[in-house]
Amino acid sequence: MATECGKEIHTYFEDARGYELENVITYYHGEDSFEMKNIFTNKAEEKVSLEMLSSFEMGDISPFLEGIGTDALLVHRLRSKWSHEGRLVTETVEDLQLEPSWSNWSVGVERFGQRGSMPVMKYFPFVAVEDSVNHIVWGVQLAHEASWQMEVYRQDDGLHITGGLADREFGHWMKEIQPGESFETPKAILSVCQGDVDLMCHRLVSAGEKYMENVPESEQSLPIVFNEYCTTWGNPSDENISEILEAIKGKGFEYFVIDCGWFKEDGVPWDVSMGDYNVSPSLFPQGLEKTVERIREKGMKPGIWFEIDNVGPRARAFENTDHLLKRDGMPLSTYTRRFWDMTDPWVQDYLGEKVIGTLQKYGFE
């Protein structure tokens, strides 16, 4: 059906148990991709527990090759880790052991993804399959900021791609749907092109441009931000920030961000003391008000750093175990971190005061 922005295709499925599924494909005028999602509705009289519900599938790749297309299909993925983001990894289907078996009985699967709130951890939520003989590329990315999975799988000649939310097996995900309730998957952005993986990535990334129209006005122009971390290395002060401001004034920076360390106590490194978030009277003897004023006087908007989800071992908050995440009854601890239980109303109020309250008090933007 036609919409104001493009076209939509709605396909409906149902079974004898009273379960219904609506597949929605959306195309936006002028774009080289489309979106896909699924909506599950429980029309039964009892609740149902979903253990897996994908957002998309593309199949029978490649129709331009005879048989299994030996050594012709390439799988492109983007790997990542902190400070090493976006490494393109290209493997043949044979390297991934996705040739069909002699009997076509079993399904071979290459499943990857991530578990938790970091959307890019080891892999980007992206995959592309290239027919290297005919130079055709199929690609997809997920619009999802939590646990996800992708699967490249094969049982016979055709290769398939599917994915969406991490399922119960991979991501410990399960959702109870009460009678009459519905559940909608995250969107997937899909495309196919004649060209290479760079063109495919351009198509998928370009699909996000329409959503940029809804960002705050201050971000419409992609403002340039100066973050002082690599200048003070976790030791910002009113004095050294004043010197930095003098050096960078008139250089086109719109924001100046005060990074970690503004809260540290004397003799305690910043990376083991986050969590209490009290302004250091030694580093900022006149409080943050004076420093924020200096930033504005130089024509920049002030910003400030928080790492709100965790606490360091030298912070008093580290011992506030009633409100920290636990595993097997004990606080979940790493080498230098414990973590707030973000579902705890006390934590929400505490961070509301320490984070939101600080932003509002000093006028950080």
Feature roles, as predicted:
Residues 251-264, 351-365:
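Active-site groove signature of glycoside hydrolases
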Residues 159-171:
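Short, structured beta-strand/loop micro-motifs enriched in basic residues and often containing a Trp
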